[in-house]
Amino acid sequence: MAEDLAGLQQLDPSPVEDSPYETNKESYFPVDDTATTTPPVLKRSDTFGLNSHSAPWYLVRIQKYSSYAFSIFSAFHIANTSIIPLITQSVPASEPYLLLTRPYYQSPVAEPLLIGIPLFAHVAAGVALRVYRRRQQYEWYGAESRKEKRQIPWPKVSGSSKLGYLLIPLLAGHSFINRGLPLIKEGGSSSINLGYVSHAFAKYPAMSFVGFASLITVGVLHTTWGWAKWLGLTPELVTQGGEEGRLSRKKRWYLINAASAVIAGLWTAGGLGVVGRGGKAGGWVGREYDELYRSIPLIGKWM
């Protein structure tokens, strides 16, 4: 052991360099000159921060673009049932305009494309998006058993989404009374016009007012806030902090609700103020309307 130690050469200590030699001051380690570098590819994302190839990306766009189609129908519908009656101040004088535009959105092709398919796609995409985010939460928290999954809360529902879910039964009831019921009982809705609505207000004022007021209020609020979201104008999309950010969010909230109030007021003025005061229909037309209203499930026996 002593011979082995004696054979070792003792060296003076020397300082060790703090860092290796760098050929590129942008990199800590030497860079191979033969290697080609490519800039990183950034994945596209939308305003909601969703990957362009992920399921939420497609679901959000289905919701968005389906609302475009139904908005076209809504514009025609508001014009026929509110704006034109408000201008003419007469139900009979407004009927020709309704009959003139009806073939464009009640034809076998236009009705599914503008109303049925977009509505179904809009609602289905919203439900699917919530289910997808729910499953994401299972993965994030590592929930495997049923008990663990129950302990994880569902994703928060926005105010606009709550209005949308509330709008479903209101819109379904409105469509059934004005489109489905005449189709079932008479084979079509050619006899359904503004006078059909006026007749309901004249004979069943309380029920008609509650139904139409609820439909207008919920529908306008959901639509206005939805469009504000697509346009990036909702308060939660304000990224600025501090007092200015708070004031900006508050201002947007008031502006969106003010726009909703104007649209709802315009619709109410023409739809309820003119059409709702048109009076009941007489003769066989009035009896036909009464028979249709009495055929409404659940509430028809009180009409």
What are these language model-derived features?
Residues 1-303:
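Membrane-embedded alpha-helical bundles that constitute the cytochrome b-like, heme-associated redox core
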